[in-house]
């Protein structure tokens, strides 16, 4: 079997789901982010409730404190829609963050959910 055939065989059942990564650079003035953090969190929660936010959160170097950098993964139909959502983030709208948008093709990985029937709660494992 050739290398190309092996690659095809290995990837034929993979997910191939297109998502968009919003990679936000560290803020030159992270202390200014605090004033806009409630609005940012409300915005992210609203995106989550709409079903377009896959995951989001701060980035830090080697366990150090967050410096204003962040990563947000969006489920949108296009890069243009993802860019529109990124531009509407209060941190970006107020000039506190710059970002880079990348298309991300999810091929492999896993997500675990645990449903507790006794209290009808769900946990992400």
What are these regions (language model features)?
Residues 1-125:
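Conserved, structured core segments of small domains
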């Amino acid at each position: 079997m050739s290398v190309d055939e092996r690659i095809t065989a290995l990837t034929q059942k993979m997910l191939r789901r297109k998502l968009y990564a919003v990679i936000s650079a560290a803020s030159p003035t992270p202390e200014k982010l605090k004033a806009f953090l409630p609005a940012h969190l409300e915005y992210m929660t609203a995106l989550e409730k709409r079903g377009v936010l896959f995951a989001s959160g701060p980035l830090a170097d080697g366990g150090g404190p967050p410096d204003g950098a962040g990563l947000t993964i969006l489920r949108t139909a296009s890069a243009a829609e993802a860019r529109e959502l990124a531009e509407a983030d209060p941190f970006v709208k107020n000039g506190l963050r710059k970002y880079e948008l990348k298309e991300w093709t999810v091929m492999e990985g896993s997500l675990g959910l645990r449903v507790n029937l006794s209290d009808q709660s769900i946990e992400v494992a």
